Structure formats: structure tokens, C-alpha cells
């Protein structure tokens, strides 16, 4: 079975590496163009490109997978199936109809819930207790195709984005093998999604990262862990936009939204609209993240200061 793999970030790269190491015949790879990344804005290859080069798999990086050059590449490698994971661009009808066995996407949510670009962050932000991975056959509508395989996991109350993403990657790797083995022998049963239950996980905007301390402690906790460690939940300390990481506890007592009540070695208790949250790390502009304890000892932060959740474009 000839496989073309389509994806871009680390999530996809780990799945691709797993397929190749397990002997699957990946005949081609499509990934997004290299882009400037990080503080230095240095152009870096996508993680999927790195894996393709390592294993000498032919790859392309088109601006659009639906243009003539990309379609010619796909036809030349002749896939039986196209596997997509976190590609970041829409596949058109010509691509979807090209492989004889279809195109399948590996999506980190329990579809039809959380269709879209940011399902991991949104399930955490919304305080969901369960999530999972869905492999479905792709159709023109975003994340709306019939389901081939779905697995569910529970979410820890203080689990961060990084931690949950890691577990979902491992689950996706296991499921990709199971799915392709079943596809190889024609043992796939597709189940239509219940479109009336669909919810959406839109692309993250800068304003989504702002912590609103007037909300209750549970909501503030969920906001911080949803963007820990990247790109980081934001607030203002005076005129400085800072990032918050490592929420470790909540308490029903306390108020004064944004007020830093108390700092110890384990973090800072910060007031919310209802209760308090304990946060371990803060990152000042242009600096590495430090514990609140280190910042207090360095006289950069003290009890009684206030964090504000305002948005400045």
C-alpha cells in the first residue's frame, strides 16, 4: 500500500516517523513551506520536512497542494491513500479524489466536537474532562467526514497543553498503525458524524491568550494551562506584557482579580473574580521564564502588585 503523508508541525512529524519505522511504504510527503520562526526569525524547515529528508522520502512544499505542480507530484508517486495530520491548509476535490482508497485525516478531538485548527487548546480552555483522536475520511467540508476510528482519553484537571499534546501524539501513532492495517485488508467501517452535535475550535488569535482575572478561578486556571507552554497565556504587569505558566492549584477563598496575594517557593496566589489560582512561573518581556519566588528575590515582583488582563493590539 503506497502512502502519501501530508502534515507540518511536530505532531505530524512524530506520526510520520512512526509509520516509516514500522515499515509502511511512504512514497511521498507534502508539507508547508519553510518559515521564519523564533525570536531571531530564522527560516527553519518544518518538522515533517526534517523527517522526510532523514529517511530520503520525496517531498514537496507547495504554497497550495491544489495547484498543478503539487497535483503532478501526487500523480507521479501514485498513492493508494493520503494520510493528513495537522497540515494547516485545505485539500481540494482533485486531491481528495486522487488516491483509490481515499484521504484520511488524524484529528486530535472527539469529532464532531472541536472541528477546526485548535482542538487541544480549546478542550483545555473549556475545562473538558475527556478528549481523544479521530481518524476520518476527508470530504470538502472541514473535519466533517465519516469516522473510521476513534479513541477517547480522560484529561487531568491540571494537565497543560504540552502534556496533553504529548499523550495525543502517542495515541495518534498507535491508531495510525491500527487504521492502516485495517485499511490494507478492507476492514474499515465508516460511521457518519452527527453534524447537529458539531462544535468548533477556531484558530487562536492574540486576544484569546489574555487572562481575564475577573472570571472565576477555574476559568483562569483553564486559560493558563491551555497555552502552557506555547504560546503562553498573557497579562499585564504595569506596562509590561507578561506570560504565565504552571498553574498548580485553585482555592475558593480570595478575591480582588489579578492581585498577587502571597508568594512562596511553590508559586504566587493570584486573586480572581471568585477564588484564587496558584501560578509558579512568570516570564517578563525579552527574558526567560522564572518562578515567582526567584522574581521576588530579585525584587522584580512583590506581593500587592496586580496583574491585568487587557488586550493591546
From Swiss-Prot:
Keywords: Protein biosynthesis, Transferase. (6S)-5,6,7,8-tetrahydrofolate binds at residues 109-112. One of its GO terms (molecular function) is methionyl-tRNA formyltransferase activity. The keyword Transferase applies. It comes from the Bacteria. HAMAP family: Formyl_trans (MF_00182). Attaches a formyl group to the free amino group of methionyl-tRNA(fMet). The formyl group appears to play a dual role in the initiator identity of N-formylmethionyl-tRNA by promoting its recognition by IF2 and preventing the misappropriation of this tRNA by the elongation apparatus. This is Methionyl-tRNA formyltransferase. It comes from Thermotoga sp. (strain RQ2).
Amino acid at each position: 500500500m503506497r502512502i502519501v503523508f501530508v502534515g507540518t508541525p511536530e505532531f505530524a512529524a512524530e506520526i510520520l516517523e512512526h509509520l516509516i519505522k514500522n515499515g509502511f511504504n511512504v512514497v511521498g510527503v507534502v508539507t508547508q513551506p519553510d518559515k521564519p520562526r523564533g525570536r531571531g526569525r530564522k527560516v527553519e524547515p518544518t518538522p515533517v520536512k526534517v523527517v522526510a529528508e532523514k529517511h530520503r522520502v520525496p517531498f514537496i512544499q507547495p504554497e497550495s497542494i491544489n495547484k498543478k505542480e503539487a497535483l503532478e507530484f501526487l500523480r507521479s508517486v501514485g498513492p493508494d491513500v493520503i494520510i493528513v495530520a495537522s497540515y494547516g491548509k485545505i485539500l481540494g476535490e482533485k486531491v481528495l479524489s486522487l488516491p483509490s482508497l481515499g484521504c484520511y485525516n488524524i484529528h486530535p478531538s472527539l469529532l464532531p466536537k472541536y472541528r477546526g485548527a485548535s482542538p487541544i487548546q480549546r478542550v483545555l480552555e473549556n475545562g473538558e474532562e475527556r478528549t481523544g483522536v479521530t481518524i476520518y475520511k476527508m470530504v470538502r467540508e472541514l473535519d466533517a467526514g465519516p469516522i473510521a476510528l476513534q479513541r477517547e482519553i480522560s484529561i487531568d484537571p491540571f494537565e497543560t497543553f504540552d502534556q496533553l499534546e504529548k499523550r495525543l501524539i502517542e495515541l495518534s501513532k498507535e491508531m495510525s498503525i491500527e487504521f492502516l492495517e485495517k485499511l490494507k485488508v478492507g476492514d474499515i467501517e465508516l460511521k457518519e458524524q452527527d453534524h447537529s452535535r458539531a462544535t468548533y475550535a477556531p484558530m487562536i488569535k492574540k486576544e484569546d491568550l489574555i487572562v481575564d482575572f475577573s472570571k472565576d478561578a477555574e476559568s483562569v486556571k483553564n486559560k493558563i494551562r491551555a497555552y502552557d507552554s506555547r504560546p503562553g497565556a498573557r497579562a499585564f504587569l504595569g506596562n509590561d506584557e507578561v506570560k504565565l505558566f504552571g498553574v498548580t492549584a485553585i482555592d475558593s477563598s480570595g478575591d480582588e482579580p489579578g492581585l498577587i496575594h502571597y508568594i512562596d517557593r511553590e508559586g504566587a496566589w493570584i486573586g480572581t473574580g471568585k477564588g484564587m489560582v496558584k501560578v509558579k512561573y512568570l516570564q517578563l518581556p525579552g527574558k526567560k521564564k522564572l518562578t515567582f519566588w526567584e522574581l521576588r528575590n530579585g525584587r522584580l515582583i512583590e506581593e500587592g502588585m496586580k496583574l491585568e488582563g487587557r488586550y493591546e493590539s
